[in-house]
Amino acid sequence: MNKLKKIGLTALAGSMVATAATAADVTVGASWSLSYTGQDSDENGGAASWTMGDSVTFTTTGELDNGWTATAYYELDDDEMDDQKLTLNMGDMGTVVFGDGAAGGFGIDNVKNFVPTADSPIFSVGLTMLAYTGGAGTTGNLAYKLAVGDTGVTVGAEQEVDAAGGYSRSMSIKYDNADAGFSFGLGTSELAPDNGSGGNTETAVGASYTMGAFKIGGNHNETDYGSTATNDVDNQHYGVSYAVNDDLTISYGVGNNSKDTAANDEEVVQMAASYSMGSISFGGYIGKQSSVGGTAGDDDITKHISMSVAF
């Protein structure tokens, strides 16, 4: 028996010696950013706040013997582990991502917003009757993306185990033609199928077109709830941006949010600008919400400005 143990240990040691580690590069990143957001609101009389970037990222990337690339990404946000993501880029065979707290972004997330902006997306200003379409969630998310040759077509899918049981799934297809300056995409999600009311579905369709310094884009997104107690919501979002020069960009966007039982549609209008000066970047927007939550007369104005430094 002792001889058998010795042979087994010797074989194990030999296999360990024969295993070669993959060379990898480790990158540590941190953000330098300061922002101010102020809000004049009919509901609360106004609010304002200063915030700063507080995340540190660790990224490890290595190339395998067969040419594939493996990446591990971790983010510490406000002194806590926030996002973790493993990526395996298999070249022509596609890319696989598993994220805990970080979605792959290959499902409906990839096509939910074609609208150009010089700063934050318009749905970050408002749309209080519903958050924008979100796909399969961010906890235990498994995603896959494949570029179909040189056609400009990319297909993607992702899923996660839903807390109510079953799987939440999201899929998308996107077409990009850089020479024509045209992009188009559509996606769908089936969420919480075992929540007792048949689950929820999301759809998104959008397109954008670039002509010189101008870019225009639009999206139509819908969320349909299986529960009759929750109202379905439609979002329409469109806008235009103009690159004045290599450093300055301005944009204008409009978002409309309608809910089945709301008396009025909620509308958000945003004007934004961004400016770069070497390693320093400035950005900001002014956004106005009308009929917040579908209630006439409830209006908000939000002002945001930020400064960031690239290391």
Name every feature range the model reports, one short phrase each.
Residues 1-311:
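Outer-membrane beta-barrel proteins
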